[in-house]
Amino acid sequence: MNLNATILGQAISFVLFVWFCMKYIWPPIILAIETRQKEIKESLTNAKKARDELYILEKKIHQNIIDAKQKASNILNSANKQKVSILEDARNQALEESKKIILNTQSEINIAITHARKNLHKEVVDLSISMAEKIIKKNISKDDNQELLDELVTSLSQVKN
């Protein structure tokens, strides 16, 4: 066989092989490559969207945490103010109660003092009458009468004080 015929046969075989590959093998490979490229692009796009959404969610969560801390702080401040108010009210009530008790006790003491003074005055009057009876019954001298009267006046002045 001739070298030219061999080269020509190989060239024709090569062209037929290339045509066959381009017609039947190349399109599915290109289609698979393009499909894979689309999937990769979609995956990258989805990953970017997910990253952006994650960033937005992180911001929202961070803001929610800040808001929750602020609300907790407000609640604590409100509770502290309410505690102070309740304690102040309780202290004021206790002071008012103690004042009422003191006033009641003082009025009871004043009543007891007045009652004691009345009883003392009654006893002094009874004593005076008793002394006067003794003076009248004894009919003693003027000096003795004067001495008894002085004692009576002294005892009366001590009782009044």
Curated annotation (Swiss-Prot):
Predominant place of localization: membrane
| Entry keyword annotation includes Membrane | yes
**Record Pfam families:** ATP-synt_B
Its annotated compartments are: Cell membrane
Offer an example of a GO molecular function term for this protein: proton-transporting ATPase activity, rotational mechanism
Q: How does it sit in the membrane?
A: Single-pass membrane protein
Q: Which GO terms describe its cellular component?
A: plasma membrane; proton-transporting ATP synthase complex
**Family assignment from sequence similarity:** Belongs to the ATPase B chain family.
Quaternary state and partners of this protein? F-type ATPases have 2 components, F(1) - the catalytic core - and F(0) - the membrane proton channel. F(1) has five subunits: alpha(3), beta(3), gamma(1), delta(1), epsilon(1). F(0) has three main subunits: a(1), b(2) and c(10-14). The alpha and beta chains form an alternating ring which encloses part of the gamma chain. F(1) is attached to F(0) by a central stalk formed by the gamma and epsilon chains, while a peripheral stalk is formed by the delta and b chains.
Give a short account of what the protein does.
F(1)F(0) ATP synthase produces ATP from ADP in the presence of a proton or sodium gradient. F-type ATPases consist of two structural domains, F(1) containing the extramembraneous catalytic core and F(0) containing the membrane proton channel, linked together by a central stalk and a peripheral stalk. During catalysis, ATP synthesis in the catalytic domain of F(1) is coupled via a rotary mechanism of the central stalk subunits to proton translocation. Component of the F(0) channel, it forms part of the peripheral stalk, linking F(1) to F(0).
- Tell me the HAMAP family matching this sequence: ATP_synth_b_bprime
Question: What is this protein's name?
Answer: ATP synthase subunit b
